[in-house]
From Swiss-Prot:
Keywords linked to the UniProt accession: Amino-acid biosynthesis, Cysteine biosynthesis, Lyase, Mitochondrion, Pyridoxal phosphate, Transferase, Transit peptide
Name of the protein in its database record: Bifunctional L-3-cyanoalanine synthase/cysteine synthase 1, mitochondrial
EC numbers for this chain: 2.5.1.47, 4.4.1.9
UniProt note: pH dependence: Optimum pH is 8.0-9.0.
Naturally occurring in which organism (per UniProt): Solanum tuberosum
Stated induction or repression of this protein's expression: Up-regulated at the protein level by ethylene and 1-Aminocyclopropane-1-carboxylic acid or naphthalene acetic acid treatments. Down-regulated at transcript level by methyl jasmonate. No effect from wounding.
Length: 351
């Protein structure tokens, strides 16, 4: 009897295991994504209302906070890693990815590395926010912070030093990788064109690696050569306007040099926006529009408002981007006063 029960038990167990193996990996006919990278893209455009009162033009802003890691950098990170894999340059589980970053690109790369199975080493200036560092570490990336006085140049140099000393290492090189620009030519640009039904007149965007303004600009120009494209750089680090690199608070913009992938010919002009203007506008967007965004989003909005107030742009549709979510900036200058206020709050008595 005992022998018979054992046979039945193991037979039942074997049958159950076999049924599990026979299950399809995904349920057919469902609208369920098979992996989180499929959530990248298709972010919405929304009109500005209160901050744009009195302007002669319409301003619509693409909300990249809706990406998996709350920033636009998910697009090029996904594109560059996939491109390198297709070319046989990197292999999950074998290659160590090394990349210099000011924050958001590093987070997106750490996210992709975790999903695909790469070891990730990121170099970044030590002035970047605590939230960025914690988020990168949460995705398993190793961080190396560099001297803030050396800017992104110092961060890039350290990344190359690590590249030489690390076995099986590879750098995707966001500042010179054509896949960065191509990501925006193939996704961001077409999304803007489709959502505006081809009615976009002006696109304005801050310049970091240059991938977004170049890719979107090239796509929109291919659809309508009359679309005007404008770039933005920090007033304090206006190298594209012939000035000198310098410290500023617009994280992700104004890297202090002209990136290789930046298409200067696609732009009408590179506007200059100060850190103070950018910070103040980012705060105003939260209070007046309910849009909690980062400092570069503030810069993009300031520039869009300037263009909207030019007489020749009356009645036109201006599109810009809010590249990242404001919660990533809680420890930065953006919310310094509120942070101190919150830290000093005292509990009230409850009867």
């Amino acid at each position: 009897m005992a022998s018979l029960l054992r046979r039945r038990f193991y037979s039942s167990e074997s049958s159950f295991a076999q049924r599990l193996r026979d299950l399809p990996k995904y349920l057919p006919g469902t609208n369920i994504k098979t992996q989180v990278s499929q959530l990248i893209g298709k972010t919405p455009l929304v009109y500005l209302n209160k901050v744009s009162e009195g302007c002669g033009a319409y301003i619509a802003v693409k909300q990249e906070m809706m990406q998996p890691t709350s920033s636009i950098k998910d697009r090029p990170a996904f594109a560059m890693i996939n491109d390198a894999e297709k070319k046989g340059l990197i292999t999950p589980g074998k290659t160590t990815l090394i990349e210099p970053t000011s924050g958001n690109m590093g987070i997106s790369m750490a996210f992709m590395a975790a999903m695909k199975g790469y070891k990730m080493i990121l170099t970044m200036p030590s002035y970047t926010s605590l939230e960025r560092r914690v988020t990168m570490r949460a995705f398993g990336a190793d961080l190396v912070t560099t001297d803030p006085t050396k800017g992104m140049g110092g961060t890039i140099k350290k990344a190359y030093d690590l590249l030489e000393s690390t076995p099986n290492a590879y750098m995707l090189q966001q500042f010179s990788n054509p896949a960065n620009t191509q990501a925006h030519f193939e996704t961001t640009g077409p999304e803007i064109w489709e959502d505006t039904q081809g009615n976009v007149d002006i696109f304005v965007m801050g310049i970091g690696s240059g991938g977004t303004v170049s890719g979107v600009g090239q796509y929109l120009k291919s659809k309508n050569p009359n679309v005007k494209i404008y770039g933005i750089e920090p007033t304090e680090s206006n190298v594209l306007n012939g000035g000198n690199p310098g410290p500023h608070e617009i994280t992700g913009n104004g890297v202090g040099f002209k990136p290789d992938i930046l298409d200067m010919d696609v732009m009408e002009e590179v506007l200059m926006v100060s850190s103070e203007e950018s910070v103040n506008m980012a705060r105003e967007l939260a209070l007046k529009e309910g849009l909690m965004v980062g400092i570069s989003s503030g810069a993009n909005t300031v520039a869009a408002l300037r263009l909207a107030n030019r007489p020749e742009n009356k009645g036109k549709l201006i599109v810009t981007i809010h590249p990242s979510f404001g919660e990533r900036y809680l420890s930065s200058v953006l919310y310094e006063d509120i942070r101190k206020e919150a830290q000093n709050m005292q509990p009230v008595s409850v009867d």
